[in-house]
Amino acid sequence: MASGTTIQPSRPSLTSNDSAVLQALFDAESSPSSAVAIDPSLSPFPEYLHISASDHESLKARELSIIRSLQSDDVSMDTITSAIRDLDALITEHPTYPSAYVNRAQALRLHIEKTAEASTDPEEAIFTPGNTESASRLFSDLGQAISLCTPRSPADPVSTVQARILADSHTHRGYLLLKAARLKKNANGNEMVGGPDKLRDMGPDQLEEMASRDFFFGGRYGNKVAQQLAVQTNPYAKMCGAIVKEALRKEVEGVI
């Protein structure tokens, strides 16, 4: 009687370089460039913004007095509108103060979601035609905050204040880009009729790549959620993942 033979599926062999590439693609924290030097001893903002530490304290106090009014669970439209006007004035007086742009973007988003029709998902209200102007302002504010806070050289360290603003702004913008990408996909290629003007003519894949880039930078500056979203939206990670899955499938099928 013949003895039974068990066929063991072979395990795909990866070189150390292959493993390193896969790790870098799928692990948001594995790459040496995935983090930046955050120096708590630095002044809140770089010198070229002309905001001293004492200026920052007074601006922060004024800003906090504005945004505290928005902390209520059922904040009124009048309160939101008033806060946006106050932030407008603050930005007009101090156009290089990045944090005010971040908070005005938040206030604009709150205003948009508050005015959403009952039949509209509040998180999708920003992409309705009636909110195009506000959505464009919101997107512009996030871009301005990022532009002001981004170090002139990638090797330059950033302050804890800079890092927080960059993490928040990149993550917020990445979320909006990802939302726009998914809405475009659901529209089956039809043009998005609302949302920020800059995004109107972009395709879903381009929007998702931009979102991935923003999540990458949000993660670099310390946002843990952005780190994970950067991996999930990374087109190269997706492509590599598909290749690996296909190779594994063929490897298994070849020995059965």
Curated annotation (Swiss-Prot):
Entry keyword annotation includes DNA damage? no
Q: What happens when the gene is disrupted?
A: Impairs growth on L-tyrosine as the sole carbon source and affects homogentisic acid and pyomelanin formation.
Q: What does this protein do?
A: Part of the L-tyrosine degradation gene cluster that mediates the biosynthesis of the brownish pigment pyomelanin as an alternative melanin. The 4-hydroxyphenylpyruvate dioxygenase hppD catalyzes the conversion of 4-hydroxyphenylpyruvate to homogentisic acid (HGA). The protein hmgX is crucial for this conversion and thus, probably functions as an accessory factor to mediate specific activity of hppD. The homogentisate 1,2-dioxygenase hmgA is then involved in the cleavage of the aromatic ring of HGA and its conversion to 4-maleylacetoacetate.
Q: State the name under which the record lists this protein.
A: L-tyrosine degradation gene cluster protein hmgX
**Member of which family?**
Belongs to the TTC36 family.
> Where does it live in the cell?
Cytoplasm
Q: Share an example GO biological-process annotation for this protein.
A: melanin biosynthetic process from tyrosine
What UniProt keywords are attached to this protein's entry? Answer: Cytoplasm
- Organism, by scientific name, is Aspergillus fumigatus (strain ATCC MYA-4609 / CBS 101355 / FGSC A1100 / Af293) (Neosartorya fumigata)
UniProt gene name: hmgX
> InterPro entries, alphabetically?
TTC36
